[in-house]
Every structure is written in C-alpha cells, then in structure tokens.
C-alpha cells in the first residue's frame, strides 16, 4: 500500500529531513463585473517539513563455522529476515503517520460492512477528494466481515476486480481495496487518496564485521 502515495524522495535533505514546498491555500474565483484596476495579493507558501525516523534491527552474530557447515547460506537468510522486519516496521510507522491522532474520522461500527465503505465514499465526496486514486486498507478481520456482508453477486463482482500485481483485492464504491494482516492499534480500516499522503526514504546502511 505504500506505493499508493506521493513519493517525496526528491525532497529529502541530508538523508534525515523532508522539506516539501507548497503553493499555499486553495484559490477562489469570483463573478464579474470586474472593478479595475485589481490589486495583486502576494501568495504565501506553506511548507511541509518532517523528520525521517531511524529504523534498525539489532546486530546478529553468525559463527564462522556456519558459513561452511550449514546446507544453506545463513548470511543471505539473515539478511532476508532483516529486510522483511525492516519493511514491515517501515510500513507500520508510515501508516501511523498517515492516520495520525487527531485528523482521522471514525465511520465504522462494531462490524465492518459495505455500508461503512459507502460512508467513507460520502465523506471523501463531501471533501471534494478526486474520484480516481482512492484506496481502502483493511485488516484481516474487516476484510472477512466485508466479504460476509456482500451478496454472492456483489462478492463475485468485487473479487473480479482484484489485481494481484498491484495488491488490490477488489474494488468497491470507487475504492481500490487492499489487505494487511493488521493496521495499527485501534484502527481496522483506513481510507485515503494517493495524492494526499506521502512517503520518503532516507539513507540506508548495513554494517558488518568479520573476525
């Protein structure tokens, strides 16, 4: 789901801080007749700045004998496990940043249903969020509840729009639905538009020491 966001890598400074320039508030238009001369007003830029979190794994020791005595490449196995752990942690931390603590709007009840997806669609419509580029991320339980709420015809139509190559498990009410085993504490479903959230990657390093 991380790829469904604005890539801010080009705005990373010194590998630690993201600085994104912004044109400021949305402009308004007026209806004539026009009084002339018009006085120009200066635009005020607003800046989006945030720090990149440092995410790491603890060092691991591989005995020298393991390089020769094991039937598999232990170093590659350890590196693969580290990459997997880092990727999962990065995804969780970015999701926390997207959801935040004060700006999210709770729409669902005790059981997730297609009506909750419709409510999310209505909320984004009210905010003039573009139709194209809307996504909905569900945890495993919400996904099960959603499928259970659909009729057989609705479920077949939903699953027919799945795209494994992009991670989309189906489309419903304008959302491309994605699945993750879990989101963050207290959140089971999250709807967003790809141009209203961003991601950025700083420097990454691996350290090794051989005896």
Residue ranges and their predicted role:
Residues 15, 57, 131-133:
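Short coil/turn connectors at secondary-structure junctions
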Residues 63-129:
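Alpha-helical scaffold segments that mediate packing/assembly in large oligomeric complexes
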Residues 1-4, 9-28, 46-52, 59, ...:
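Sequence/fold signature of self-assembling virion shell proteins
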Residues 25, 34-46:
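Active-site-surrounding "flap" and adjacent substrate/cofactor-binding loops of secreted or lumenal enzymes
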Residues 100-169:
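Extended, solvent-exposed, turn-rich assembly/linker loops in the middle of proteins
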